[in-house]
A protein has these predicted regions:
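Electropositive phosphate-/nucleotide-binding environments in soluble metabolic enzymes
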Residues: 34, 50-57, 82, 86, ...
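Active-site loop/helix belt of alpha/beta enzymes
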Residues: 2-13, 18, 170-308, 312, ...
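Structural preference for beta-strand elements that scaffold enzyme active sites
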Residues: 75-77, 97-99, 118-122, 141-143, ...
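A charged N-terminal "starter" segment
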Residues: 1-143, 149-162, 198, 204-210, ...
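Charged (often Lys/Glu-rich) extended helix/loop segments that serve as interaction or gating elements
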Residues: 275-277, 282-410
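Short, basic, glycine/proline-bearing loop/turn elements
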Residues: 73-74, 118, 137-141, 262, ...
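Short acidic, glycine/serine/threonine-rich loops at helix termini
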Residues: 88-90, 112-114, 133-135, 155-158, ...
Length: 410
């Protein structure tokens, strides 16, 4: 990870950029969702993920309010690939406030098992196998968005006359990094390209399919400054509407980003809703949005314990009991999980590098960050671990064990 700006953890330093009503220090103790983080994590010697159901529901409510303010009918679908912890999914399903965006047959099972009704599940994926197609054909009440001519042909053969959606590659991309940009100048595997559109329409007619939905997902992690490009991607896809007489819905995908450091901006939901209003208010189309990170990322922490502290070659290394395999985004996508001590010790801050326990040189959580004194056995909470962390984890070096806790209401 790149070095971060120094941040004071002194008790009188005022609020940190990430603090909010349900996350912050109280008398030197980091508290989350009304509980001491150190106390919540103390019952296990393994790495522990903590999730706040209340924060997830609050994020969902904020997004739904923004969607409502846009003056369009629509709904939110949680991208469950971001976090598939069953108690969390069940909480959302029982709330009735959102549906589920899924991208594999096993995610269909997870969504149904959590209690999401089939009518509130939408499937969008790529590189589908014949078995995938057969599975989708067995779920007539689940919405299906197809993203290739091959999938369209095989689905049409298997389920002629079905109502479907088509995922479009708008050739405009947005994202938190180049690796999170799903369309643009460089060809990608996602979506149907403009030069393929005539053939796609021919297949729709051949198999008697009814296209009710257009789908676009241009990338992940976009913030306010990328809204112009995001809207351009939607406009590109919306230009295809005249050739789709049965179109009733537009799925704008997910990708809504959250800040990871003090220097990052946030996504202005007012401007996001304004863009939706300007694009869709007069179209008569309903709008679906499929966020993952925006709903769950800042509702989760990963708590790791300090194994050792040692000076090597002029660098103070703080080793912890979990590595990048538990939360790959900091290494893969340069999306940091900022470390915060769970209890503040008195003393001067030191510049440290936090290292994981995986036998890979890149397994560094943070390099050259100023932190207050730490000791072996202390706990460190890594922020923004609620999305694409446990769900992307691996058992590399056979160190994939962890616990997950849905934090109870205080």
């Amino acid at each position: 990870m790149k070095p971060l700006p120094a941040a004071s953890f002194a008790l009188d330093a005022g609020k940190h950029w990430w603090e909010r009503a349900d996350l912050g220090f109280s008398n030197g103790e980091l508290c989350f969702a009304g509980h001491s983080v150190a106390a919540l994590a103390s019952w296990s010697d393994r790495p522990v993920f903590l999730y706040s159901g209340e924060r997830v529901l609050a994020n969902l409510a904020r997004l739904q309010a923004a969607l409502d303010s846009a003056g369009v009918s629509g709904a939110v679908l949680l991208a469950i690939k971001a976090n598939r912890f069953p108690p969390l999914l069940t909480t959302l399903a029982r709330s009735g406030r959102c549906g589920a965006d899924v991208c594999s047959p096993n995610e269909i099972k997870a969504a149904l098992s959590a209690g999401f009704p089939a009518e509130k599940i939408s499937f969008t994926a790529t590189s589908l196998s014949d078995d995938d197609i057969a599975n989708l054909a067995r779920h007539p009440r689940i919405a299906v968005n197809l993203d290739s001519l091959s999938a369209l042909r095989r689905f049409g053969e298997r389920a002629p006359g079905r109502t479907i959606g088509l995922r479009i590659n708008p050739e405009v991309g947005v994202g938190g990094s180049a690796k999170l940009t799903y369309s643009g100048r460089k060809p990608t595997k996602f979506g149907i390209y403009s030069e393929q559109w005539p053939e796609a329409l021919a297949m729709v007619r051949q198999y008697g399919l009814r296209v009710s939905t257009l789908h676009v997902h241009a990338g992940c992690g976009y913030l306010t400054e990328q809204l112009t490009s995001w809207r351009a991607a939607i406009d590109r896809a919306l230009s295809l509407r005249p050739s789709l007489p049965d179109l009733t819905c537009f799925n704008v995908g997910g990708g809504l980003g959250v800040p990871h450091t003090a220097t990052w901006g946030s996504l202005d939901l007012r401007l996001w809703a304004q863009a939706l209003h300007q694009t869709f208010a007069k179209t008569g189309l309903s709008v679906l949005v499929e966020p993952g990170d925006f709903i769950v990322k800042d509702a989760g922490l990963l708590v790791l314990k300090v194994n050792g502290i040692e000076d090597k070659g002029g660098t103070r290394f703080v080793s912890v009991n979990g590595g990048f395999n538990l939360a790959p985004e900091p290494v893969f996508y340069d999306l940091p999980c900022e470390p915060v001590p769970c209890r503040l010790r008195v003393g001067a801050e030191r510049r440290v590098t936090i290292a994981g326990n995986i036998n890979e040189a890149l397994d560094l959580w943070y390099e050259d960050i100023m932190l207050p004194p730490l000791a072996e056995g202390d706990s460190i909470a890594f922020l923004n671990a609620g999305g694409y962390a446990s769900s992307m984890s691996s058992n590399h070096c056979l160190r994939g064990d962890f616990e997950e806790i849905l934090v109870p209401q205080p």
